[in-house]
């Protein structure tokens, strides 16, 4: 993927990149919440906490790293985070065989 324009081929490439690296998490209805908001309300939750990293952030990290060219990947990546983003970047880098440095505050 390049720039801000998103093409259908970009989506297909990203789908292929993510398919064998992420858990296909379920989508479930939330009847308790639906009852609060009326009978015609349907509320769904995507259970991304079931991902390897425990959050949805692995999708974004894999997407960004997957968009880098070979020279950029060879240089490695750096993330500044002490939370879920750090975990996701570490996971994505490992999955793609890329060196990663995670910087955390004290």
Predicted regions and their residues:
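PLP-dependent amino-acid enzyme catalytic core
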Residues: 1-106
């Amino acid at each position: 993927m390049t720039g801000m324009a998103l093409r259908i081929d970009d989506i297909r490439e990203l789908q292929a990149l993510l398919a064998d690296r992420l858990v296909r998490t379920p989508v479930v209805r939330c009847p308790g919440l639906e009852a609060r908001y009326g009978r015609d309300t349907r509320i769904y939750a995507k259970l991304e906490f079931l991902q390897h990293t425990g959050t949805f952030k692995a999708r974004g990290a894999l997407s960004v790293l997957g968009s880098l060219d070979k020279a950029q990947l060879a240089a490695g990546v750096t993330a500044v985070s002490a939370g879920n983003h750090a975990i996701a970047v570490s996971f994505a880098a490992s999955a793609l065989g890329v060196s990663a440095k995670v910087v955390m505050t004290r």
